[in-house]
């Protein structure tokens, strides 16, 4: 997969690209990540890429021509171009998996100031947000999305690790424990030390459903529960009601 990130702050990504799994994924050629300085594509003096908005208003807008030049230079028949914007569709684990499977070349556009000249809509396939809040620019969302997709690429991390991630299966992850067995009176649940794989699986499923029901019930609304999950969830609700 190729990910091209368009930004006016290319140095923002230096540490991100040279640390941990992202670094290894690049070195192993499992992903290609390129950072493009938008200022190199403006015709205005001093690398200027913004101007005042027509009709008035606070702040400055990023001008359209540099985006047009750079994106058309990068685009291929396999390109999917995304504008990072608080107005966009919310990015989630399902989107990350879908893009991992279906997109060969992803362009991420980082906005700044009061936004971008709306003619940018002629160049993009989708607007994406990482949540209902506003940041100073698109660089952090670009890193979030790049990290989320890259870790799903085969060989970057063990598949068993991400298949049990929170949200990967549409549920929050069950509680996990490691050594020491007991600390300050807090002990690891006995069932996890039993060696009984089926009982451990059922315990984890129950805890996962319980955590999701308590913290993110919205995730269960559209979930097609299995008979096993429905039975366990009914038990959870009864137990909570009796408390």
Curated annotation (Swiss-Prot):
**UniProt EC number:** 2.1.1.228
Q: Which domain of life is it from?
A: Bacteria
Task: Kindly report, in one word, the top-level EC class recorded for this enzyme.
Answer: transferase
The record's subcellular locations are: Cytoplasm
Q: Which residues form the signal peptide?
A: none
Residues holding S-adenosyl-L-methionine:
111, 130-135
Q: What InterPro entries does UniProt report for this protein, alphabetically?
A: Alpha/beta_knot_MTases (IPR029028), tRNA_m1G_MeTrfase_C_sf (IPR023148), tRNA_m1G_MeTrfase_TrmD (IPR002649), tRNA_m1G_MTases_N (IPR029026), tRNA_MeTrfase_TRMD/TRM10 (IPR016009)
Q: Name one GO biological process term.
A: tRNA N1-guanine methylation
Asked whether the UniProt record includes Transferase among its keywords, one would answer yes
Task: Give one GO term, molecular function aspect.
Answer: tRNA (guanine(37)-N1)-methyltransferase activity
Q: Which reaction does it catalyse?
A: guanosine(37) in tRNA + S-adenosyl-L-methionine = N(1)-methylguanosine(37) in tRNA + S-adenosyl-L-homocysteine + H(+)
Can you supply one Gene Ontology CC term for this chain's record?
cytosol
Alphabetical UniProt keywords: Cytoplasm, Methyltransferase, S-adenosyl-L-methionine, Transferase, tRNA processing
Q: Does the keyword 4Fe-4S apply?
A: no
Principal location class: cytoplasm
Annotated HAMAP family: TrmD
Role summary:
Specifically methylates guanosine-37 in various tRNAs.
The annotated subunit structure for this chain is: Homodimer.
Family (UniProt): Belongs to the RNA methyltransferase TrmD family.
Which named protein is this?
tRNA (guanine-N(1)-)-methyltransferase
């Amino acid at each position: 997969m190729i990910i091209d990130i368009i930004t006016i702050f290319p140095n923002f990504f230096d540490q991100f690209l040279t640390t941990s799994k992202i670094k290894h994924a690049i070195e192993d050629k499992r992903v290609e990540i390129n950072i493009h300085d938008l200022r190199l594509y403006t015709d205005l003096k001093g690398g200027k890429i913004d101007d005042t908005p027509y009709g008035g208003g606070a702040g400055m807008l990023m001008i359209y021509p540099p985006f047009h030049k750079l994106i058309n230079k990068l685009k291929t028949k396999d390109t999917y171009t995304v504008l990072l914007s608080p107005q966009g569709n919310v990015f989630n684990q399902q989107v990350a998996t879908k893009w991992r499977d279906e997109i060969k070349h992803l362009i991420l556009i980082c906005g700044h100031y009061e936004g971008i000249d709306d003619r940018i809509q002629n160049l993009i396939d989708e607007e994406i947000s990482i949540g209902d809040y506003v940041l100073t620019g698109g660089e952090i969302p670009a890193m979030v999305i790049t990290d989320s997709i890259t870790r799903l690429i085969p060989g970057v991390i063990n598949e068993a690790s991400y298949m049990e991630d929170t949200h990967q299966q549409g549920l929050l992850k069950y509680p996990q424990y490691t050594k020491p067995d007991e600390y300050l009176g807090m002990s690891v649940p006995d069932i996890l030390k039993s060696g009984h794989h089926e009982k451990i699986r059922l315990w984890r499923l129950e805890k996962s459903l319980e955590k999701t029901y308590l913290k993110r019930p919205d995730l269960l609304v559209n979930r097609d529960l299995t008979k096993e999950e429905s039975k366990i969830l009914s038990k959870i609700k009864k137990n909570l009601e009796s408390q």
